[in-house]
């Protein structure tokens, strides 16, 4: 499992105190990093040249952001998918997501190669099997893809568009599905990675140009890179925060990995030991990402 393992320490990109910093994604048209603070109900745009963030506040939790155009993004609020105009802040509704009378909220999501938004959910308190995975089309149609999920997370697609990788956090496994890009149909194809004991649980995830999976591990203090064909752990990025929630490749060459973290669930003692929890980190791990898919 630990063949050729490389260990890397990241730099601090932007100091923040996000309760749960999540949903990191590099906007290919704006060359900036978008991310969210779920409980803070805030969308952020990190501008590397300025080393600062713009922000947009919402009236509900916000968990996912994906690019659409150079002036718009699509955001998952607690129970709704909306379009946000980044110039004037105006929003329009795209689709509603079932919330079981306020017991369920949106969690992680990304667009597939054909521009459909896949958005997963979780229950408040994370009751087992209460959540689902949905696919949202540009016309607002919502398809149910998976049910009996607990905490839907980490979804990416292979370069050849034949496989989708996904995790339900408490299972501590990354699942591979056969994927049909024209229809969006998926078929279970086995376990790609079993998360090693003592390294936390899989949260957000991104994929590099060689199809290796970079997985933010909640409670694992790092981002872990796996070969999805062998399950081998290749690289560990040791982050100075126990709860690592998401990661995304960015920068002009897509060779910088940005990492978001959380303060949620940490004791006062842990926050004293890890004061940068809730911040955004970055490093160049020797791999290149792939451009984010836009909603269309």
Locate the predicted segments by residue.
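A short beta-strand motif characteristic of beta-propeller blades
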Residues: 9-15, 51-57, 92-99, 141-147, ...
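Conserved small/polar residues in nucleotide/adenosyl-binding loops
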Residues: 1-5
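A short loop-to-beta-strand structural motif that recurs across blades of beta-propeller domains
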Residues: 42-44, 80-82, 131-134, 173-175, ...
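Hydrophobic alpha-helical segments and helix pairs
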Residues: 90-147
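Conserved beta-strand positions in repeat-built beta-propeller and related beta-rich domains
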Residues: 27-28, 33-38, 74-79, 119-127, ...
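Loop/turn-rich, solvent-exposed surfaces of beta-rich toroidal or solenoidal domains
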Residues: 173, 177, 194-230
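Beta-rich, blade/repeat-based domains predominating
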Residues: 16-30, 58-74, 100-116, 145-163, ...
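Short loop/turn segments immediately following beta-strands, especially the blade-tip
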Residues: 177-185, 285-290
């Amino acid at each position: 499992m630990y063949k050729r393992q490389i260990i890397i320490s990241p730099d601090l990109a932007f100091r923040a105190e996000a309760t749960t910093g999540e949903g990191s994604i590099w906007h290919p048209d704006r060359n900036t990093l978008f991310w969210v603070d779920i409980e803070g109900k805030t969308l952020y745009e990190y501008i590397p040249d300025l080393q600062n963030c713009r922000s947009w506040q919402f009236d509900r939790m916000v968990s996912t952001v994906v690019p659409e155009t150079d002036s718009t993004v699509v955001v998952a609020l607690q129970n709704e998918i909306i379009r946000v105009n980044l110039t004037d802040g105006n929003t329009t509704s795209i689709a509603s997501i079932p919330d079981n009378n306020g017991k369920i909220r949106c969690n992680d999501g990304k667009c597939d190669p054909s521009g459909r938004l896949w958005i997963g959910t979780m229950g408040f308190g994370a009751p087992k099997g209460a959540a689902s995975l949905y696919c949202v089309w540009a016309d607002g149609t919502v398809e149910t893809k998976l049910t009996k999920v607990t905490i839907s997370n980490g979804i990416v697609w292979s370069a050849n568009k034949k496989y989708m990788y996904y995790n339900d956090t408490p299972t501590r496994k990354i699942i591979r599905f056969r994927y049909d890009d024209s229809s969006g149909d998926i078929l279970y194809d086995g376990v790609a990675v079993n998360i090693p004991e003592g390294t936390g649980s899989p949260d957000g995830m991104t994929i590099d140009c060689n199809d290796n999976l970079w997985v933010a591990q909640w409670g694992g203090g790092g981002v872990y890179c796996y070969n999805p064909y062998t399950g081998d752990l290749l690289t560990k990025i040791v982050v100075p925060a126990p709860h690592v929630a998401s990661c995304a490749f960015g920068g002009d060459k897509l060779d910088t990995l940005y990492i978001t973290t959380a303060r949620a669930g940490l004791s006062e003692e842990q926050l004293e030991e890890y004061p940068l929890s809730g911040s955004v980190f970055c490093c160049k791990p020797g791999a290149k990402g792939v451009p984010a898919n836009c909603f269309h």
